Structures are given as C-alpha cells and as structure tokens.
C-alpha cells in the first residue's frame, strides 16, 4: 500500500478548472505599474484566460495529486 501524492498547493491557488475541464488562470500585468497601460489594455487583462494546451496535462496532474 503506497502513499497518496498530495495536491500541489501553489498550483491550486493559481489555477481553476472550468466546467469543461480547461485550466484557467489570471492574466499577468495588473499588479503594479499598470498606469502606463491604456484603459483598453487594463480592461482586457481582467478576468481569466485558458492555459496553453501543452501545459494542461501538467496542471491537471498537479491539481489531481498525480505524479508528473
């Protein structure tokens, strides 16, 4: 009987799975020094966006407690 592999907590805080199973994350560039960006750019950085397809298996594995 082996031990379970734990969920990676850093990944859990940064990523969420959508209803269809896609990994979603917040966009970068809004924490500070955003005043220099146009309002349109700041508005478009709001919300979440899907992760690149090549990273999906790694993120799913980290969230579901599997080794990768």
UniProtKB/Swiss-Prot annotation:
Residue stretches of biased makeup (Basic residues): 1-25
Name of a matching Pfam family: Ribosomal_L35p
Chain intervals for the UniProt region annotation (Disordered): 1-43
GO BP term, example: translation
InterPro entries, alphabetized: Ribosomal_bL35, Ribosomal_bL35-like, Ribosomal_bL35_sf
GO cellular component: cytosolic large ribosomal subunit
Keywords: Ribonucleoprotein, Ribosomal protein
NCBIfam families documented for this protein: rpmI_bact (TIGR00001)
HAMAP family (alphabetical): Ribosomal_bL35
PANTHER family: 54S RIBOSOMAL PROTEIN BL35M, LARGE RIBOSOMAL SUBUNIT PROTEIN BL35M
Recorded family membership: Belongs to the bacterial ribosomal protein bL35 family.
UniProt name for this protein: Large ribosomal subunit protein bL35
Native organism: Rhodopirellula baltica (strain DSM 10527 / NCIMB 13988 / SH1)
Taxonomic path: Bacteria, Pseudomonadati, Planctomycetota, Planctomycetia, Pirellulales
């Amino acid at each position: 009987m082996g031990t379970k592999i734990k969920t990676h907590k850093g990944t859990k805080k940064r990523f969420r799975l959508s209803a269809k199973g896609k990994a979603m994350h917040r966009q970068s560039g809004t924490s500070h020094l955003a005043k220099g960006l146009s309002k349109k750019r700041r508005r478009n950085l709001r919300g979440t966006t899907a992760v690149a397809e090549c990273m999906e298996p790694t993120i799913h594995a980290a969230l579901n407690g599997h080794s990768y």
